[in-house]
């Protein structure tokens, strides 16, 4: 019962037809989730029908060119994908620029894309931490600030995670962006 990974070669034309726009010929890697694209199409209908929104917070990147980001995570650490795949979370980083292009094709509006750090700082997370920790013992304050640092530090989740707000075209909302 040996498990293997398959590298499925697909025609760029097929991928372009699925995502709805032409991909640069200079791309060495095309990484996207067809299932995620289907989910986004279904969600977009609900967003349009209900004048709703979708807030995405995930690790990803903002560059135009696609990257090979497939990885395995075990106990909060990147592990060897081929040796640890049974005991790891297999994941990849979202290409937020690709997601924005798809959002436009689906006739939705991207209200903003930013880092988790900027989003939380713009929403006043530091002031909130000060308020809730004001009368707490030192150990509880330290815990709050330790967790805050993890969320907004550039070397931790602050820059790795991105935040994107997708809404119906009739909505204007930029809080946090």
Question: Which ranges hold each PLM region?
Answer:
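Long, Lys/Arg- and hydrophobic-enriched amphipathic alpha-helices
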Residues: 15-177
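Short phosphate-coordinating micro-motif centered on Lys-Gly-acidic
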Residues: 1-11, 17-19
């Amino acid at each position: 019962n040996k498990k293997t990974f398959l590298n499925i070669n697909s025609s760029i034309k097929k991928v372009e037809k699925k995502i709805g726009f032409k991909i640069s010929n200079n791309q060495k890697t095309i990484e996207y989730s067809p299932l995620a694209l289907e989910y986004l199409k279904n969600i977009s209908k609900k967003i349009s029908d209900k004048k709703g929104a979708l807030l995405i917070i995930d690790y990803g990147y903002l560059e135009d060119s696609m990257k090979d980001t497939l990885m395995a995570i075990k106990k909060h650490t990147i592990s060897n994908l081929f040796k640890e795949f049974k005991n790891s979370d297999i994941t990849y980083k979202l290409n937020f620029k690709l997601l924005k292009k798809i959002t436009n094709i689906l006739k939705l509006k991207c209200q903003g894309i930013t880092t988790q750090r900027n989003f939380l700082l713009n929403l006043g997370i530091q002031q909130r931490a000060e308020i809730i920790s004001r009368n707490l013992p030192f150990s509880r304050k330290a815990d709050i600030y330790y967790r805050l640092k993890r969320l907004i530090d550039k070397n931790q989740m602050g820059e790795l995670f991105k935040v994107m707000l997708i809404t119906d075209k009739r909505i204007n909302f930029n809080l946090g962006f």
